[in-house]
A protein has these predicted regions:
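Short, small-residue-biased leader/transition segments that mark boundaries at the very start
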Residues: 2-4
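Intrinsically disordered, low-complexity boundary segments flanking structured domains
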Residues: 9-12, 75
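A contiguous, surface-oriented mixed alpha/beta subdomain in the mid-to-C-terminal portion of proteins
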Residues: 11, 15-21, 41, 60, ...
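Structured aminoacyl-transfer and RNA-binding surfaces used for tRNA recognition/handling
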Residues: 6-9, 36, 40-43, 51, ...
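Aromatic-lined carbohydrate-recognition surfaces of secreted/lumenal glycan-active proteins
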Residues: 18-31
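Short, solvent-exposed polar/charged micro-motifs at secondary-structure junctions
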Residues: 31-34, 129
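Catalytic-face loop-and-helix region of soluble metabolic enzyme cores
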Residues: 47-155
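Active-site mouth loops of central-metabolism enzymes
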Residues: 33-45, 93-98
């Protein structure tokens, strides 16, 4: 039940004195996951149900897959006020994002997340990726985040 899920999440962080985070994952780019994702339709609206519950939880940070995800970005509005790790790097592909692609993902998220609560990150872990690909993706993440930081600090 939904009450049980929230109680389980609260119990997991009980007594912790640090910031807490939950990562909502659609899985790595392995064949079983990519096949499953194809069955989910053109929009993944499951967050519509989960986000209001997360909004009421004691969790401080919500980590989301945003780049190349089919989750509508506007659903992030349902967790406004939480810190949000915005996944701007697709870990299910060896294709390197450009800094501008990263910046575009972050700009979209900024419509629903206050700038001081947005944490640019990857969609998930990069363990399955070749090291040179992971390094290139992290460089794009850093450069894309820097583009947006400059825009926010100098809006003219």
């Amino acid at each position: 039940s939904d009450v049980y899920k929230r109680q389980t999440l609260e119990r997991a962080i009980e007594g912790l004195k640090c910031e807490t985070a939950v990562h909502i994952c659609y899985g790595y780019g392995i064949k079983a996951n990519t096949d499953w994702k194809k069955t989910l339709g053109s929009e993944w609206r499951q967050y519509e149900e989960a986000f209001p519950k997360l909004q009421k939880s004691s969790i401080d940070i919500v980590s989301l897959e945003c780049h190349n995800s089919r989750v509508p970005m506007d659903l992030i509005e349902l967790i406004r006020g939480k810190k949000v790790m915005v996944g701007a790097i697709d870990v299910a592909s060896n294709t390197l994002e450009t800094p501008e692609e990263v910046a575009n993902t972050l700009r979209k998220a900024l419509q629903f997340v206050d700038a001081d609560k947005l944490y640019p990150c990857t969609n998930c872990g990069m363990a399955p990726l070749p090291r040179h690909v992971a390094r290139g993706k992290l460089q794009a993440l850093s450069a894309g985040a820097e583009i947006v930081r400059r825009e926010l600090s100098n809006p003219y």
